[in-house]
């Protein structure tokens, strides 16, 4: 959304919850992407598990400001994203959108994003995992955590210079694909910033594709 620099960028965030199990000897060796859960074996013999299609989207002021960009995407993916209205709306309502440079910015006051995992999502993922693989019945949940995923209306990142702000380059909105395309994206952005021709075509990731 439009911030203190006056640059428009339609981006929201969803919260994903994950758990880690104790080691399981007879568990699957390959990564599993099931109908309602995913799991992947870890180097310590345990598994990282999440519930498929259970990302949580907090309804915040930007949800309304950016509705025209995101409505079609949400309608197409409403079975995979849960909406939640709670205190996060009022917390973000109090964040100033313009702030003087001689005061602490909202980014300085909120340095760490460490959201609480969804207890319901963790319990459902665990129950479905045990149902599919009985070998997990004697395992334990050793840790659970959550994180925010930045998303754009078309689930593709923006990797481009911001035309109205010379020297500002944007690489954001990877929509959950950051680990997969991050290395190539980093190389392409480094080339772009240095004035070189990127090794990949960045036109599909241009800043202005949302009408910005």
Please give the residue ranges for each predicted region.
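A short catalytic or substrate-binding loop motif that flags glycine-/basic-rich loops and adjacent residues
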Residues: 31, 150-151
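C-terminal active-site/capping subdomain that shapes the small-molecule cofactor and substrate pocket
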Residues: 10, 140, 156
């Amino acid at each position: 959304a439009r911030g203190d620099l006056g640059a428009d960028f339609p981006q929201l965030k969803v919260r994903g919850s994950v758990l880690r199990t104790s080691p399981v000897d007879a568990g699957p060796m390959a990564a599993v992407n099931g109908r309602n859960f995913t799991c992947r074996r870890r180097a310590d013999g345990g598994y990282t598990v999440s519930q498929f299609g259970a990302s949580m989207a907090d309804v915040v002021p930007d949800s309304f400001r950016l509705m025209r960009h995101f409505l079609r995407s949400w309608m197409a993916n409403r079975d995979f994203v849960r909406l939640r209205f709670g205190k996060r709306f009022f917390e973000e309502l109090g964040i100033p959108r313009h702030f003087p440079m001689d005061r602490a910015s909202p980014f300085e006051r909120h340095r760490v994003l460490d959201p609480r995992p969804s207890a319901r999502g963790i319990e459902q993922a665990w129950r479905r995992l045990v149902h599919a693989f009985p070998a997990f019945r004697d395992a334990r949940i050793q840790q659970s955590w959550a994180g925010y995923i930045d998303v754009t209306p078309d689930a593709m990142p923006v990797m481009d210079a911001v035309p109205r702000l010379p020297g500002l380059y944007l690489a954001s909105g990877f929509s959950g694909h950051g680990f997969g395309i991050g290395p190539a994206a980093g190389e392409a952005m480094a080339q772009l910033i240095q004035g070189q021709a990127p090794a990949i075509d960045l036109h599909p990731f241009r800043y202005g594709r949302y009408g910005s």
